[in-house]
């Protein structure tokens, strides 16, 4: 195993950020596919918060954080099945010696959380 990352966020924090900054906030953090998926849900803020937590957890598991080596939109959470999949630049994974990143996300009424394992 290379690393483990975990994150938790209040869903209301994402809602307030969207209400304050609008599309500018969304376009900085989330890919177009993530935005479309989340706003197709009855509670888009819970889905957005889960993806935000996932991005943070992945960055922690890789040990890069969000910044120079890894940008927000370079981490994309996809749902091809019931299990969430995460897409990260292959070149970065290779440079770190990471073969894959596993992801688990969940949310309640108030919080979203994610755990990522890089191996």
Curated annotation (Swiss-Prot):
Keywords: Cytoplasm, Fatty acid biosynthesis, Fatty acid metabolism, Lipid biosynthesis, Lipid metabolism, Magnesium, Metal-binding, Transferase
Cofactor requirements of the protein: Mg(2+)
A single Gene Ontology CC term: cytoplasm
First-level EC class: transferase
InterPro entries membership: 4-PPantetheinyl_Trfase_dom, 4-PPantetheinyl_Trfase_dom_sf, ACPS, Ppantetheine-prot_Trfase_dom
Keyword set includes Cell inner membrane: no
Location of this chain's protein in the cell: Cytoplasm
Species: Chlamydia trachomatis serovar D (strain ATCC VR-885 / DSM 19411 / UW-3/Cx)
Gene3D superfamilies: 4'-phosphopantetheinyl transferase domain
Reactions catalysed according to its record: apo-[ACP] + CoA = holo-[ACP] + adenosine 3',5'-bisphosphate + H(+)
Coiled-coil region(s): none
Similarity remark: Belongs to the P-Pant transferase superfamily. AcpS family.
Keyword Lipid metabolism: yes
Protein name listed in UniProt: Holo-[acyl-carrier-protein] synthase
Binding positions (Mg(2+)): 7, 56
Function: Transfers the 4'-phosphopantetheine moiety from coenzyme A to a Ser of acyl-carrier-protein.
Main location, first listed in the record: cytoplasm
Record GO biological process: fatty acid biosynthetic process
Pfam families according to UniProt: ACPS (PF01648)
Gene: acpS
A GO molecular function held by the record: magnesium ion binding
